[in-house]
């Protein structure tokens, strides 16, 4: 289990992980690592929250929020943000399904992708600032938001098909079963409940689950399935929806 965690941490983040800690794990077995996603999100959110706490006293709430969002993006190598941008470029191109998928593979940033990045990053900064000004525990909020967003991404993997013939997303999409999905969502719910007592965290997770489920169905209808890019988009939007639900 520990080897699986380190393999997933290395796979979906840019945090340094010694290669020997995940050696011997077959790439085809990575789908089992979905249950570690909430824990990895918890770690990323906690680091981002610590950055906010350290900087808040020095440079104020808005800049602390800016740098915490920046650190979160750096820890993932902009992986999920890139997926969000590619998804928006493809989906909002209003082309055929095959052409949308081609556009999503284009490394160039389009207008829709650029607007999506600006909106999501700016919205995160503003929502974090507002929550901090209300006296909310930002460390706990970010840890819960990142755990829940990565946990609910399982909703785009379970009983979905991969929209392409090959790609990194194919490791998870359509490869996880109902038990893995329930365990992943259950862990995310536990983290949300413990970090944000009084049912606030669980309620925000329910809102996030509904939003991500609807997103998955819309993408399925538009693209014929999911891709690694749509998973990244779901994680980014899941973080934002969770934080918005706490306002």
Curated annotation (Swiss-Prot):
Pathway: Cofactor biosynthesis; adenosylcobalamin biosynthesis; adenosylcobalamin from cob(II)yrinate a,c-diamide: step 7/7. Keywords: Cell inner membrane, Cell membrane, Cobalamin biosynthesis, Magnesium, Membrane, Transferase, Transmembrane, Transmembrane helix. It is found in: Cell inner membrane. Its cofactor is Mg(2+). It catalyses: alpha-ribazole + adenosylcob(III)inamide-GDP = adenosylcob(III)alamin + GMP + H(+); alpha-ribazole 5'-phosphate + adenosylcob(III)inamide-GDP = adenosylcob(III)alamin 5'-phosphate + GMP + H(+). Its main location: membrane. It is a multi-pass membrane protein. The keyword Nucleotidyltransferase does not apply. GO terms for cellular component: plasma membrane. Its EC number is 2.7.8.26. The keyword Metal-binding does not apply. GO terms for biological process: cobalamin biosynthetic process. InterPro entries: CobS. Joins adenosylcobinamide-GDP and alpha-ribazole to generate adenosylcobalamin (Ado-cobalamin). Also synthesizes adenosylcobalamin 5'-phosphate from adenosylcobinamide-GDP and alpha-ribazole 5'-phosphate. PANTHER family: ADENOSYLCOBINAMIDE-GDP RIBAZOLETRANSFERASE (PTHR34148:SF1). This is Adenosylcobinamide-GDP ribazoletransferase. It comes from Shigella boydii serotype 4 (strain Sb227). The gene is cobS.
